[in-house]
C-alpha cells in the first residue's frame, strides 16, 4: 500500500500534460467558448482572428473554422432533428442550409507569433448542443462543439 501512493502521484503528474489542448477555459461556459472559437459574423483575417483564441490556451491552435453567422442562427440549428456525433453521442444537429465560413490553418510560427492561411468555404455544418448553463443565452439548447463541416 505504501508503494501505491508514490505511483499514484507519479501518474497524476504525468497525466497533466496530456489533458486535451482543445479543452475550454473553465471561466467560460462551453457555449461562450464555442462562440469565441467559431462565431464570426463578419470575416476577419485569420492571424488576427486566431490570436484571441490562442491567447486563452497559450499555444498556436493548428486549425479552426469560423462560421460567418450569428450565435442566434447557429443556436437555432440545435432545434433541428438530432443526429449521432463523431463521439457517438446523440446531441448533434446539422444545419439546414450551407453558410459562409473560413477555415484557418497554422502555417508557421510559435506562440504568440502564430501564422495562418485562410480558405473561404460555403458548406453545411454539424454542431453538438447541450442545455444552457446559467450565464448562457436562454435557448432550449446551445451549441457547444463544432463537430464537422460537410
UniProtKB/Swiss-Prot annotation:
The active site is at residues 38, 145. Keywords: Antibiotic, Antimicrobial, Disulfide bond, Endonuclease, Glycoprotein, Hydrolase, Lysosome, Nuclease, Secreted, Signal. Glycans are attached at residue 100. It comes from the Eukaryota. Substrate binds at residues 61-65, 86, 105. The record marks 61 as: Critical for catalytic activity. GO terms for biological process: antibacterial humoral response; antimicrobial humoral immune response mediated by antimicrobial peptide; defense response to Gram-negative bacterium; defense response to Gram-positive bacterium; innate immune response. GO terms for molecular function: endonuclease activity; nucleic acid binding; RNA nuclease activity. Its main location: secreted. Ribonuclease which shows a preference for the pyrimidines uridine and cytosine. Has potent antibacterial activity against a range of Gram-positive and Gram-negative bacteria, including P.aeruginosa, A.baumanii, M.luteus, S.aureus, E.faecalis, E.faecium, S.saprophyticus and E.coli. Causes loss of bacterial membrane integrity, and also promotes agglutination of Gram-negative bacteria. Probably contributes to urinary tract sterility. Bactericidal activity is independent of RNase activity. This is Ribonuclease K6.
